[in-house]
Amino acid sequence: MAEKSYVFNDTETTGLNTWFSQIIQIGSVLTDNEFNVEEELNLNSKVLPWVVPTKGAYETHKQTKNLNEGMSHFDMMHFLKNKWLGWGKTKELVHVTYNGMKFDEELFRRQFYWNLIDPYLTTNVNGSSRVDLMVIICLLYTSDAA
């Protein structure tokens, strides 16, 4: 069995609706199985011309430079794909998010698909898997975990 490594992911987006929002910033941190940081990644892309950002998103993350600066969304998603595939060549990756199953993972799938990339990259490649810390915390600290 291959050694496991963890990839902690977070996104900043143009809104909360996963059908219409765009990822404009992705942060990923690769750690070994003892959570020692091996590599960090911070990617930004310009907002696509047909995406209408919500005011609330920009009030939250303050990423206004992405309106005019950064790489193209296509380039960002392909760079991310290549980086994650590189990290996973010799290790089984566990992608870790907070509320990722309902938000970040949905955005990754849609936007990988938009850019002609396998939408199941975080679960279908070299034994990769994922975990949502929000689900674990809800199970540990609430009596009515959903």
What are these regions (language model features)?
Residues 2-112:
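Conserved non-catalytic scaffold segment of RNase H-like nuclease domains
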